[in-house]
Amino acid sequence: MANPVRTRFAPSPTGYMHVGNLRTALYTYLQARHKGGTFILRIEDTDQGRLVEGATDIIYNTLRATGLTWDEGPDIGGPVGPYVQSQRMGMFKQYAEQLVKAGKAYYCFCTEERLNDLHEQQKANGEMSHYDGHCRDLPQEEISAKLAAGVPYVIRQKIPAEGVTGFDDVVYGHIEVNNSELDDQILIKTDGMPTYNFANVVDDHLMGITHVIRGSEYLSSTPKYNLLYQAFGWEVPTYIHCPPVMKDAQHKLSKRNGDASYQDLVAKGYLPAAVLNYLLLLGWAPEGEQEIFSLDEMIKIWDPARISKSPAIFDPLKLRAINAAYIRALPAEEFRKLADPFIDQAVHVQIDRDLLCANLQPRCEVLEDIPPQLDFFDAVLPIDAEMYRNKKQKTTPESAKEALSALLPVLEAQTDWSRDAIFEACKQKAEAMEKKNGWLLFPLGIALSGKARTPGGGTDLAAMMGKEETLRRIDHILATLKPAE
């Protein structure tokens, strides 16, 4: 019987959550949940120089906001803790010593100066930088003497000199590498701390990880990982390597280069569920045409074999389209709650926000698009008379003056200032003048906003602004428009 599925998301707390990392978290979560398994959060903080204060909280908050809840982790514990790598430091050296005794690793006493000279020579010869095996077969007496004398050392993995090492990956299939191409990587550094690669393998084994999901940049390291598993006699996990997330055909998306993090996207007004939905499709293809999936639906349809081998190019337009679908599906009160902070950036006068939001929601793709649309509420914008010229509505600057002059007494007499009542009164006036509605209402929208495109038509804007402001703006515009000759 197969072991219960156990997956882990193991980020380093080095800043904001990159979208590629969040995609890895999603795929790792889906693999566990689809199989009824356990999803583990492990914090890999051994690179102390790159740690950013507060970054661990960002990891927690991001996963919670997107619904990727974990079963074991630093904050909730579990049977194989601690779940912070720096708190596990004492255990790694003994595993490396075990490999030394088995002849699968060795002490390396090379100084930094020797290694620098070696790499300079290799560079001059046009060779790839690699360790030359200088300490690989030292006599035991020499090793014992150096250890007794306190000579600094690292412990290196002893890669077989001949043969090939292969592994199977769910996405990339069977991969084989000549052992001669693999470097004797360092397992334990001179300060006694493990390297990332070594700690990763030991922790994954001790935590019972059955499926390792990570970026394809780790494909080249995987043969070394496998040799470590074999050296210990441990079961090798199932590997699922994901293609890189690219900014374009040449450049990887990278938070070091200032590319959007999850936090950046949310600050701009992308919804967490929409971002997650987009990341599902960033390098993974569902069956059929459906593209909008709830998290429960994602769990149900998940199949890692449908991950693409090709790099996934981040498509902002696709993300906007998915976000727009999520915004349209929100309950009205939820949209109002999310939109209010963005409305606050542009509007500082009293308006009917519920009506505004009812007009914004069907048109809104990203919440940060809202403020630039609303700059006319606080102050009357300068209006070019030519804005009133519209072939479809058959309007001109001169006809606009006639239309607004006809509308002014109608609106002054209006006691019910609801949108529908205002529209009905304007419609009746248009019929009485034997004009189409647009002939009257297009100039009204321009007069109230100074813009050709607004969140709602003229009667919507009038209802949002209120009667007093509507009449004031029409009066102001009438004073500036020339009459028809």
Task: Give residue ranges: language-model regions.
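Residue-level signal for inorganic ion chemistry
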Residues: 18, 28, 59, 99, ...
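Glycine- and acidic
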Residues: 7-13, 41-45, 207-212, 260, ...
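Active-site cores that bind ATP or allylic diphosphates and position pyrophosphate for catalysis
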Residues: 101, 106-241, 247-253, 261, ...
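Helix-rich, typically C-terminal accessory recognition domains appended to large enzymatic cores
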Residues: 418-465, 469, 478
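Long, amphipathic alpha-helical coiled-coil segments characteristic
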Residues: 391-421, 426
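N-terminal Rossmann-like or analogous alpha/beta NTP/dinucleotide-binding catalytic cores
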Residues: 2-124, 222-234
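Generic alpha-helical structural context detector
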Residues: 61-64, 97, 120, 230, ...
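Catalytic adenosine-cofactor/nucleotide-binding cores of aminoacyl-tRNA synthetases and other
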Residues: 48, 232-388, 393-394, 449-485
